[in-house]
């Protein structure tokens, strides 16, 4: 199955587009007891490094008309590298739909051109008020947003819940960031729904106005946001391959 499949064959893991629920039995009491005990006994250090909850929107690289609200739970490896677990909501039942890696422009410029094509810029997404740390006053997050505007991200979606997949099916799909140009502009109803739910004002008089003086990158590498210049996206397909008989590395 390709990552660009619109309608995978009907399976118990396909339940329609609205709030797909994974197949399976209710969680047993014994499992809940284990979870509670493990929570007390284990440090869960990688998970506890997630310090921010950011909400934004993402588009499928092979079909920019498929647009989804995304929730990034962000861990900072250092000032130049972030790693984000991406969920479809911030509810307790949220699905882990992918992962995004974010790097500074300095690191991005050191990547090979073929690698850069898989990444997207964040400048418009930030300046337009689409990316925001939920519940954090703009005055507190403004410096972080200014830094983020100069970054690039690579986002793989592993669970296409928006098409009704009740489990992660097929190959990962590459995602891209919203842009000002069609067809990369996020639909207004998606933004309004998000803003109403969280009490956010991303209109021209809200976050956009607050960020209008924010410095923009001197340039955005043309290898990023590949579709804008080439009119094409990327999709992943799964093909059989010969297994390696010898270790590739010493």
Swiss-Prot record:
<dbReference type="Pfam" id="PF06884">
    <property type="entry name" value="DUF1264"/>
</dbReference>
<feature type="compositionally biased region" description="Low complexity">
    <location>
        <begin position="8"/>
        <end position="18"/>
    </location>
</feature>
<comment type="similarity">
    <text>Belongs to the OBAP family.</text>
</comment>
<dbReference type="InterPro" id="IPR010686">
    <property type="entry name" value="OBAP-like"/>
</dbReference>
<protein>
    <recommendedName>
        <fullName>Oil body-associated protein 2B</fullName>
    </recommendedName>
</protein>
<feature type="region of interest" description="Disordered">
    <location>
        <begin position="1"/>
        <end position="29"/>
    </location>
</feature>
């Amino acid at each position: 199955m390709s990552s660009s499949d619109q309608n995978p064959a009907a399976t118990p893991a396909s339940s329609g587009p609205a709030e797909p629920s994974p197949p399976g039995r209710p969680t047993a009491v014994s499992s809940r007891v284990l979870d509670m005990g493990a929570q007390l006994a284990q440090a869960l250090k990688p998970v506890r490094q997630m310090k921010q909850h950011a909400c934004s929107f993402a588009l499928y690289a092979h079909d920019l008309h498929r647009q989804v609200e995304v929730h990034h739970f962000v861990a900072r490896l250092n000032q130049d590298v972030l790693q984000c677990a991406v969920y479809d909501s911030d509810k307790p039942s949220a699905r882990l739909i992918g992962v995004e890696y974010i790097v500074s422009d300095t690191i991005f410029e050191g990547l090979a051109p073929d690698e850069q094509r898989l990444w997207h810029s964040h400048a418009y997404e930030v300046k337009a008020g689409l990316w925001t740390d939920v519940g954090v006053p703009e005055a507190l997050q403004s410096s972080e947003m200014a830094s983020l505007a100069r970054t690039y991200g690579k986002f793989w979606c592993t669970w296409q819940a928006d098409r009704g997949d009740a489990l992660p099916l097929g190959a990962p799909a590459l995602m891209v960031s919203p842009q000002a140009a069609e067809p990369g502009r996020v639909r207004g109803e998606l933004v309004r729904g998000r803003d109403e739910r969280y009490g956010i004002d991303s209109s021209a008089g809200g976050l956009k106005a607050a960020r209008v003086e924010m410095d923009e990158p001197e340039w955005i590498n043309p290898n990023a946001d590949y579709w804008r210049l080439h009119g094409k996206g990327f999709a992943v397909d799964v093909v059989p391959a010969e297994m390696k008989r010898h270790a590739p590395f010493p």
